[in-house]
Regions:
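Primarily extracytoplasmic ectodomains and periplasmic/lumenal surface modules that are beta-strand-rich
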Residues: 37-51
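Surface-exposed amphipathic alpha-helical segments
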Residues: 190-250
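Short, surface-exposed beta-strand/loop micro-motifs that present aromatic residues
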Residues: 176-187
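Conserved polar/disulfide-associated segments of primarily extracytoplasmic proteins
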Residues: 54-172
Length: 250
C-alpha cells in the first residue's frame, strides 16, 4: 500500500495546499469525502483556488499520489480569498496512491503501519515513546525549510496515524512551524490517505491535530457505510454548484 514513491508523496504534501469536491472515484468506486467540521471546499470558480489546486495536483502526481479532495477552515478561506490573509494555516486533504487505484491495496492497515514504523526508525534513531517529547526533540534538530517525519502517532483497527513537522519560510515572508498528521485507511477496498495541517503553537498542538484527524477518519467511515449513521454527506461549501465536479477525477 505504501511504496517508497508514496512515502515521498507524504513528505511532499507537507509543503503544499490544494482542493476538490466529493464523491471522488477511485478505480470507478465512489468514495464520499466529508469535509471536517468548520471546513469548506475550495471552488473551481475561484481563480486563486483553481491555481492552488492545479499546482498541488501536478506536484503530487509526480510523486505517485492523486489529490482527491481538500478543504480549509471556512473563515481562513474567506479571508484568504478576499486578501485579508496571505496563507491558509488549517486545512485538510484526501489522497490516494495512483498505482493502486484500479486494484485492491497491497497491504493491510496493520502492515502499512509496520512500514511507517520502519521508516520512522530509519529517520529517528531513538524514537521517543511520548509523542510530545518526540516533537520537541525533532524541533531542536530541523532547520528552516526542512521536513522531518515524526513516525507513527497512533494505530487502531481502521487506520494508521503518523506525523510530519516542518519549519517553513513562507511566500509571505514569514516563518512558521507546521504540523501535519496523516491517516492511512482502506475504504471500499481502496487506499485513502487523510491529512490535517496546522500551525505548531505549543506541546498540545500535535495531540489536538491528531484528535481532529481521528474524528475526520470516523466521519469518512460513516459517510461510506461503515458506521451506525452511514449516509452520503452534504459538504460545507459556500456554493455547492461551484465546487469541482467529479468529472475532474479518475
Amino acid at each position: 500500500m505504501l511504496s517508497r514513491l508514496a512515502f515521498a508523496a507524504l513528505l511532499l504534501t507537507a509543503v503544499a495546499a490544494g482542493a476538490l469536491a466529493s464523491p471522488a472515484r477511485i478505480g470507478g468506486v465512489p468514495i464520499y469525502l466529508p469535509a471536517p467540521h468548520g471546513f469548506c471546499d475550495l471552488s473551481e470558480s475561484n481563480p486563486s483556488d483553481k491555481r492552488m489546486v492545479t499546482t498541488l495536483t501536478g506536484l503530487l502526481e509526480k510523486s505517485g499520489n492523486k489529490l482527491l479532495g481538500m478543504s480549509a477552515d471556512c473563515q481562513q478561506l474567506t479571508d484568504w480569498r478576499t486578501g485579508k490573509r496571505q496563507l491558509l494555516d488549517d486545512y485538510a486533504q484526501y489522497q490516494t496512491p495512483i498505482g493502486s487505484m484500479d486494484k485492491p491495496p497491497s497491504e493491510t492497515v496493520a502492515q502499512t503501519c509496520a512500514t511507517l514504523r520502519q521508516e520512522g526508525n530509519k529517520i529517528l534513531e531513538n524514537q521517543l515513546p511520548d509523542i510530545k517529547a518526540r516533537v520537541e526533540s525533532t524541533l531542536t534538530k530541523i532547520k528552516m525549510n526542512e521536513t522531518s517525519f515524526l513516525g507513527v502517532l497512533a494505530e487502531d483497527a481502521n487506520a494508521c496515524y503518523a506525523g510530519l513537522i516542518q519549519k517553513i519560510h513562507t511566500e509571505a515572508g514569514t516563518d512558521k512551524t507546521q504540523i501535519t498528521a496523516f491517516a492511512v485507511t482502506i475504504i471500499k477496498n481502496k487506499s485513502v490517505f487523510g491529512y490535517r495541517f496546522s500551525v505548531y503553537r505549543n506541546q498540545q498542538t500535535i495531540g489536538v491535530v491528531l484528535g481532529k484527524l481521528k474524528a475526520d477518519v470516523s466521519a469518512l467511515l460513516v459517510a461510506n457505510g461503515r458506521g451506525p449513521q452511514a449516509q452520503a454527506p452534504a459538504r460545507q461549501s459556500e456554493n455547492p454548484s461551484n465546487s469541482l465536479s467529479s468529472s475532474t477525477r479518475k
